[in-house]
Amino acid sequence: MINEFPEEYDNLDIDISIKHVVEGALASKLSGYFLIQNNKFSFSAVAFGRIGGHNINVKISKTTGDKIRKLNLDPEIVILIVQRKIIEGDITIQTKKQ
């Protein structure tokens, strides 16, 4: 697969954790966080998949975007990477302890 992200993002380590999922008939709502350089960033998302395959729409707050910019990263590119990782299953799903 061709990487469409700028070269400086090739070695960016992003760990994604899903904390909460609400499943629906057509879409699921997710919330969680991702870690970049020991910085924790919260997000919400809507995941769906029908004709055309799976898709996800990740949202972050303006404040979160500003914090990502302070790391000299483009929040739009970070969101695209997070979305791709979620679709590819490169995530941790947190479960409630019994």
Question: What are the functions of these language-model segments?
Answer:
Residues M1-Y33:
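Negatively charged, low-complexity tracts enriched in Asp/Glu with abundant Ser/Thr
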Residues I2-E8, D13, S42-Q98:
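Acidic, low-complexity intrinsically disordered segments
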Residues L26, L35-V46:
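Short, cysteine-centered beta-strand-loop-beta hairpins and adjacent loop/turn segments enriched
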